[in-house]
Structure formats: structure tokens, C-alpha cells
Curated annotation (Swiss-Prot):
Gene: tpiA
Protein family (similarity comment): Belongs to the triosephosphate isomerase family.
Gene3D superfamilies: Aldolase class I
Record-given protein name: Triosephosphate isomerase
Function: Involved in the gluconeogenesis. Catalyzes stereospecifically the conversion of dihydroxyacetone phosphate (DHAP) to D-glyceraldehyde-3-phosphate (G3P).
Gene Ontology biological process: gluconeogenesis; glyceraldehyde-3-phosphate biosynthetic process; glycerol catabolic process; glycolytic process
Binding site for substrate: N10, W11, K12, G180, S220, G241, G242
Domain of life: Bacteria
Keywords, alphabetical: Cytoplasm, Gluconeogenesis, Glycolysis, Isomerase
Amino acid sequence: MSRTPIMAGNWKMNLDHVAATSLVQDLGEALKAAGYDSSKSEAVVIPPFTDIRPVAIIIDGDKLPIAYGAQDISAHDDGAYTGEVSGAMLSKLGCRYVVVGHSERREYHNESDELVNAKAKKVIENGMTPIICCGEALEVRKAGKHVEHTVGQIKADLDGIPAEQVAKLVIAYEPIWAIGTGETATADDAQEVCQAIREAVKELYDAPTAEAVRIQYGGSVKPANVAEIMAKPDVDGALVGGASLKAGDFSKIVTFYEA
């Protein structure tokens, strides 16, 4: 099965709505100049909540070949949950993707696999696609337990999600020690864990589901290293942080297939 690579830019808590509007316009121009072919990779931006509507207006108005999504979702549908944003709200904004279980949410907000699982289900219930993040800290990697740890996370995060939904979702492997540090897992490191994740999905479900699910690598992806990472058979995209805040850099990452 041919899996379309998905290159997603996670803007994290950066850019107000004015700067976000400017960036997505610049990205649209950069992709056009690069001759971007959306059949060869999918371009996605994941802005902060306050930027989603302005970004959507530009993308929809200019008919840019870019999808957009959100960085988090509430596990609740509505009600007295101050500060939360529901799946229905995000779906109404036109979000196609929602990141759940990012390492920063797990670390700074103590999000458990149980909560990540509940959030992933809410994304699916509201007609969007979850990007489920998993990955190990440096001490786990040094202990040689990175595969065991990451596969354990994914098994818990997918609990109760049917095969037909798993086939459509995205899993992002992010070695925590390589996020924003300048340290990069080698392409072989990325392949080792992404392959193990695919094998785990095969064990949990079946071979067709494992063949269909898209698995991203996230961790200091840059124009200089993206082609090598994307050449690996079980890496189907990138979850990009800092480099996605520069239109030129992210355009080069999205059009990695030209390298």
C-alpha cells in the first residue's frame, strides 16, 4: 500500500494571529514556487488555538494546498471545563488533524496514556484525525528500553480504537531527547522504532491496518536531514517544530521528495 507522507508543522506556543497569517501566506507562496505536488506529500500546519481561524481564512480563501489542525483537544464534549476546547469546536473550525499526547503535554501537564486514549477517541468521534505522539526520554534510550517503552505507550493509546479507525490515523514517534535540542536520532534510530510501532499495530490488529497507518518521526527535523529520514521504509512523514516557523525551511521539508 502506498502511504502519502504527512509533513506537519507544530507551531507550539508561538506566533500571534497576525504573525500566523503572515507565515501561512509565505508558506503558500514558498510551496507554489517549489512546484509542490500534494500527491507526493501532505502539508499540514498545527497553530495555537487563537490562530486557527485566521489561518483557516487564508488557506480557504487563497485555496492553499495546506491542511490545518489543533495542538490539543478536551476529553469532554462540553460543560464547566474552563480553558478546555472541545472536538466539536475544532471540527466546526475545519480542523482536519489534532495532536494528542505530545511529549510536552505528557511532561508539563501530566497527561497519562489513559487520557491520551480518551482524547484520541474524541478526535475520531468528531470526524478528525488524531496524530498520536509517543517516544522515550534520554534515560530510557540509554537503558536500551526505547522500543519497549514506545510500543507500550502506543498499545495503551490505541486501546479500544477499532482497526478501521487506526488505519486512518497518524502516529508520531518523537524521541524526547531530540526535541528542540539540536540532537537528532539517526535515520536508522527512527526506522528502528517506527518499524517496531508498525509491528505492534500488526500484532494488535492485522497486517492491512499496519500497512495503512502513517508513522511520522519528530525530533529536530530540518531541510538538511529530512531526505535521509524519509528514505526509511517505515517513516511516513515528519512532525516538525522549530523549522516549521520559517516558511522557506518548512517548504523544503514538505518537498523533501525533490532532494
